[in-house]
């Protein structure tokens, strides 16, 4: 082959490589970060069919990964009679093309799907059920350009605004006796996240002293609060008594985000950890020992919540639509890492589940 032909081939190869456009990286959603206010566009509401057809899908599971080797709190063996009961509230997008998230509820087996909030152009997040299952707390961007805490009576649909503050109030949760609530308050003047405790109607609100953090969760006896914080540098989980005393760091996991839960018997805590698109659920003893990966790898699992009987965990994951921004669905799994089931099946995101009676 002469030099002219070689030169011609080299020119063609260079031109061809220059035409290849690198694939754009898929944006990584962060569904549990501190909320930023925005006003979604107007759009008509589609009809919602009730209940969801074929709600339960059994998926293959992997054995939970042991993180520690110390003596463990025994995990109850599953029984065929231990089927999920109660209700799960969660954030549902309803409209795939806009950001007007709503609050929805369904039975613990995925049936009986129902939308609770009705303001199409307002965003609603972080629902949680009352101990009697009759009310739901949530954060909403309804008036005054602020996220405030609201309470809805599920039976009547009546809504009451519980907070009226300057800043962001989110992640509310009822105390175990239903008489108080805790939530996170972010003050734009201080730019800090504070944990607040108030009466269940929003009165007598007080910050827990010396605490900065988010995503608070009550202990079953109502004496402690579990929360996420970067007070020691990297984000970890801490417990504190409601008067601000006895602060204990209980985790040493990489890239913890927040939303965690405490089992009703007080023995276990479940959280999630990991880099974007590689997050997993972890089960541990209440003091932070005996950490085990609960979910199979590859689902980008987030936002866990125990069932009232402590035998199941509800969470958000992308097992069926990995790397799809609209691919998050609600799943449940037994606390021994078996019997993974998908409860929702939509073309929009369902996330932030909270289990109740």
Where are these regions (language model features)?
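N-terminal secretory signal peptides that target proteins for export/translocation
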Residues: 1-2
């Amino acid at each position: 082959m002469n030099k002219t032909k070689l030169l011609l081939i080299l020119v063609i190869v260079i031109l061809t490589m220059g035409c290849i456009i690198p694939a754009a990286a898929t944006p990584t959603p962060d569904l549990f970060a501190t909320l930023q206010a925005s006003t979604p566009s107007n759009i008509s509401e589609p009809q919602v069919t009730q209940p969801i057809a074929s709600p339960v899908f059994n998926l293959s599971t992997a054995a939970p990964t042991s993180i520690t080797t110390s003596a463990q709190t025994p995990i109850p063996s599953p029984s065929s009679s231990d089927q999920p009961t109660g209700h799960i509230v969660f954030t549902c997008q309803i409209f795939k093309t806009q950001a007007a998230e709503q609050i929805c509820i369904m039975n613990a087996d995925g049936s009986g799907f129902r939308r609770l909030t009705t303001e199409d152009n307002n965003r609603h997040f972080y629902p949680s059920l009352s101990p009697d299952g009759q009310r739901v707390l949530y954060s909403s961007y309804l008036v005054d350009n602020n996220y405030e805490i609201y309470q809805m009576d599920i039976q009547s649909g009546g809504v009451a605004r519980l907070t009226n503050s300057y800043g962001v109030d989110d992640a509310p949760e009822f105390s175990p006796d239903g008489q108080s609530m805790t939530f996170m308050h972010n003050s734009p003047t201080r730019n800090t996240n504070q944990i607040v405790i108030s009466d269940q109607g929003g009165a007598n609100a007080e910050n827990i002293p010396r605490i900065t953090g988010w995503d608070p969760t009550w202990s079953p006896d109502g004496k402690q609060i579990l929360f996420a914080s970067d007070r020691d540098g990297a984000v970890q989980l801490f417990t504190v008594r409601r008067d601000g005393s006895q602060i204990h760091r209980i985790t040493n996991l990489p890239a913890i985000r927040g939303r965690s839960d405490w089992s009703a018997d007080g023995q276990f805590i479940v959280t999630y950890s990991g880099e974007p698109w590689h997050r997993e659920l972890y089960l541990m003893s209440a003091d932070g020992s005996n950490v085990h990966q609960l979910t199979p790898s590859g689902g980008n699992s987030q936002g866990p919540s125990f069932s009232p009987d402590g035998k199941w965990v509800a969470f958000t994951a992308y097992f069926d639509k990995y790397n799809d921004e609209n691919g998050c669905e609600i799943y449940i799994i037994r606390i021994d890492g078996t019997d993974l089931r998908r409860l929702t099946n939509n073309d929009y995101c369902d996330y932030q589940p909270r289990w109740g009676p």
